[in-house]
């Protein structure tokens, strides 16, 4: 039975960099929204000697996620790891759109993989530095459980809370809330994964040199670099190394936690105040 790693958002900079690392000892299945981009990414990986394939998946549709995992399992393949990098940033849509993709999409991927997970399997959810450091009074954490039971109500609460500041900040706040949710939800699901002998973690990137990272940098996110310890954008390979390690069998005791990979941004913010 061949070990398989599924990577959502697989054609992006983070996804491809992770595929190159995991592809040394895993069969790779890429998932994204555009088949042409998937096909091009698969050709690229195969040229490097990686056993790769891919299929379209809409993570906001649970049936589409189930179809993705069935595709990955076809032919007696076992999904050893899922690295869930798919998501959107504030500049890519409305507050509701951001909440749906980042939060509800994560629920769908997590629940679908949990139903299949066995001893030694791992799920790595990508959160964000934006999910850290928000005032607790601002984060609608009481609504987080609704993402599982009533996603429509969850989205409405996120959108409503994102309106506490000016319109320009609506999507940004929704993004921060959605990523705080990913961190919370990945911790919440640790026991369920553990009951199957499997692991779940979240990883929170800071500012990275990817298409999405550049988009946000052009709209003010680059200001965070001024307070960071390293004073530069992270390289896709640097975050991929962490994602691939978490997805591998090496950190067998690592679960139910978040790993912050932000070049010292949060540390800089904290100690700048002191």
Q: Where are the model-predicted features located?
A:
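Short, flexible catalytic-loop segment of classical short-chain dehydrogenase/reductase
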Residues: 132, 204-215
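C-terminal helical subdomain
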Residues: 108, 174-175, 180-183, 202, ...
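The beta1-alpha1 cofactor-binding region of Rossmann-like NAD(H)/NADP(H)-dependent oxidoreductases
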Residues: 56-67, 103-106
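Conserved glycine-rich Rossmann-like NAD(P)H-binding loop of the short-chain dehydrogenase/reductase
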Residues: 25-40
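Short C-terminal tail/terminal secondary-structure segment
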Residues: 255-274
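Conserved glycine-rich cofactor-binding loop
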Residues: 11-12
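Catalytic loop of short-chain dehydrogenase/reductase
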Residues: 88-92, 122-195, 207
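Short, small/polar-rich loop/turn modules that mediate ligand/substrate recognition or access, typified
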Residues: 194, 199, 254-256
């Amino acid at each position: 039975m061949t070990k398989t790693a599924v990577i959502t958002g697989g054609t992006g900079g983070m996804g491809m960099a992770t595929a190159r690392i995991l592809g040394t000892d895993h069969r790779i299945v890429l998932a994204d929204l555009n088949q042409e981009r998937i096909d091009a990414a698969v050709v690229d990986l195969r040229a490097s000697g990686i056993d790769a394939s891919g299929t379209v998946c809409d993570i906001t549709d649970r049936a589409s996620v189930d179809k993705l995992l069935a595709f990955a399992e076809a032919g007696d393949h076992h999904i050893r790891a899922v690295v869930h990098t798919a998501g959107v940033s504030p500049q890519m849509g409305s507050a509701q759109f951001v909440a749906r993709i980042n939060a509800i999409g994560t629920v769908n991927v997590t629940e679908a993989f949990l139903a299949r997970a066995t001893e030694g399997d791992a799920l790595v959810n990508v959160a964000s530095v934006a999910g850290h450091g928000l005032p607790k009074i601002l984060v609608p954490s009481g609504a987080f459980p609704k993402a599982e039971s009533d996603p429509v109500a969850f989205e409405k609460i996120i959108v409503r809370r994102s309106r506490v500041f000016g319109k320009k900040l609506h999507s940004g706040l929704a993004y921060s809330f959605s990523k705080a949710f990913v961190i919370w939800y990945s911790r919440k699901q640790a026991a369920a994964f553990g009951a199957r002998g499997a692991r779940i973690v979240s990883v929170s990137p800071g500012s990275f040199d990817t298409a999405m990272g550049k988009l946000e940098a052009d709209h003010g996110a680059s200001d965070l670099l001024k307070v960071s310890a390293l004073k530069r954008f992270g390289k896709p390979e640097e975050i991929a190394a962490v994602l691939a390690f978490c997805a591998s069998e090496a950190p067998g005791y690592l679960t139910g936690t978040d790993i912050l990979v932000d070049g010292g941004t949060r540390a800089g913010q904290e100690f700048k105040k002191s």
